A protein has these predicted regions:
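Hydrophobic anchor at the start of a short beta-strand
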Residues: 8-14, 119-121
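Active-site metal-binding core of divalent-cation-utilizing nuclease and nuclease-like domains
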Residues: 13-89, 100-103
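Conserved catalytic or regulatory cores that recognize and/or transform ribose-phosphate-containing ligands
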Residues: 69, 79-80, 138, 169-171, ...
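Active-site-adjacent loop/helix micro-motif of nuclease/hydrolase catalytic cores
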Residues: 89-107, 130-133
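Nucleic-acid nuclease catalytic cores
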Residues: 112-156
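Polybasic (Lys/Arg-rich)
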Residues: 147-175
Length: 175
């Protein structure tokens, strides 16, 4: 979702705050390097914590510190804060499908329990089930100031809008 914000919002800097387990399971440095981001400074004691910059001057800071929002960007004079939950998306196993459902509910709940600094977005993997649930939740979430975004297997991001909006689901591909 951090790459999506860099591509679609008027910002040059996005902060990512992974929890400890996410940092152990995901190679942030290699993933950013494949996207032409070079590490320019270090933060904390992890090998991946630090600020990364690409040739266009865009920066991603990876700081494994909890309580700050999973992905945060300042856009103009407001803040976009996203809570993200991952999961296995190419499965029909009932336990995994249930976990994806719970992940969406959990991200919405986390955002509701956090004071809003600006736009709040619940971000989960795109599956048929999460799309249906997101469409059902979208209107109530909008009343609470929470947006829902679903991320597909290839990085495409779909913003789920409440029924009645002109465009219910909008898709943008982010590789």
């Amino acid at each position: 979702y951090a790459m999506h914000l860099l591509r679609t919002q008027d910002t040059q800097h996005v902060r990512v705050h992974p929890d400890g387990e996410h940092g152990k399971q995901f190679d942030f440095a290699a993933w950013l390097l494949r996207r032409d981001f070079i590490k320019i400074s270090s933060i904390g004691t992890t090998s991946y914590g630090g600020t990364y910059r690409n040739a266009a001057g865009q920066e991603i800071t990876v700081n494994p510190k909890s309580g700050l929002g999973d992905v945060v960007a300042e856009v103009g004079n407001h803040v976009i804060s996203a809570e993200c939950k991952g999961g296995i998306i190419n499965t029909r196993h009932s336990g995994q499908v249930s976990r994806l459902y719970k992940g969406l509910c959990e991200t919405v709940g986390m955002l509701m329990a956090t004071p809003s600094q600006g736009r709040q977005v619940a971000v989960v993997p795109l599956t048929e089930g999460t799309r249906r649930l997101a469409e059902r939740l979208a209107a109530r979430c909008a009343l609470a100031g929470i947006e829902i975004a679903l991320v597909g297997a290839r990085g495409e991001v779909m913003d789920v809008k409440p029924a009645g909006d002109n465009e219910r689901v909008t898709g943008r591909r982010d590789e």
